[in-house]
Amino acid sequence: MSKIFVNPSAIRAGLADLEMAEETVDLINRNIEDNDAHLQGEPIEVDNLPEDMKRLHLDDEKSSNLGEMVRVGEGKYREDFQMDEGEDPNLLFQSYLDNVGVQIVRQMRSGERFLKIWSQTVEEIVSYVTVNFPNPPRRSSEDKSTQTTGRELKKETTSAFSQRESQPSKARMVAQVAPGPPALEWSATNEEDDLSVEAEIAHQIAESFSKKYKFPSRSSGIFLYNFEQLKMNLDDIVKEAKNVPGVTRLAHDGSKIPLRCVLGWVALANSKKFQLLVEADKLSKIMQDDLNRYTSC
């Protein structure tokens, strides 16, 4: 009777596929729950109406005063009733942003460029805000306390802005000083820290978000891993990817970035499971080879 031998690496690959399928189902369920989160809020009840509105009564004996009171109410509370009763503009705006986010993900998965999608989305958001949140008329006279508060707020805003400007420079210094994975040579440096670079990195990562990459395992075999298994936001992945030597320069030039190297870098820094599975020395060599191959092109 013949015996059938099964390669251990095939078993490990099958187990990895099953685990990835379970994690994908969990990720889809969490996305569905997050998208429906705004539907679980309690309705807002308006208990206190303006005094002039409380005095409105449908009384035949006071029909002459009714029209006068309505005109007063319209003049005094015109801004309070621009939207339908019971509609909170903040909730509507949050729901609108949720739909915009879902639409962006769909367009990116269909292959559209991120910069084009983002420019169109910004125009739509600005148009929505302009229509539904018009600027209130400025008052001709303000008391001294209001002016003082405005000046203090301006100072706080200026100081906060200066702190935010200093953060990227500090981040670049830390990225240059911090050591990388073992045996990974720092042969390139990050450059051009701007929004266009982040957009290009995000676009390339999003296109390959579900693609599986091979990594060396501690058991002298290989295992498959992708960006979805990180369970991280795309923005956080991009921020971590910018610390990979040479990635920002490649993205600034519009070149392809070494996605397997980026995935290994981010996973090694944020995934304990990945750290337990991967062979660190072999991973460092693979990442260095990928980086050298892409930067030499």
Curated annotation (Swiss-Prot):
Role description: Non catalytic polymerase cofactor and regulatory protein that plays a role in viral transcription and replication. Stabilizes the RNA polymerase L to the N-RNA template and binds the soluble protein N, preventing it from encapsidating non-genomic RNA. Also inhibits host IFN-alpha and IFN-beta signaling by binding and retaining phosphorylated STAT1 in the cytoplasm or by inhibiting the DNA binding of STAT1 in the nucleus. Might be involved, through interaction with host dynein, in intracellular microtubule-dependent virus transport of incoming virus from the synapse toward the cell body.
Name listed for the protein in its UniProt record: Phosphoprotein
Modified residue annotations for Phosphoserine: 63-64, 162, 210, 271
UniProt-annotated stretches for the region Disordered: 133-177
Assigned protein family: Belongs to the lyssavirus protein P family.
Polar residues compositional bias, start-end: 158-169
Gene Ontology CC terms: host cell; host cell cytoplasm; host cell nucleus; virion component
Effect annotated for changing residue 36 to Q: In strain: Isolate PM1503
Single Gene Ontology MF annotation: RNA-directed RNA polymerase activity
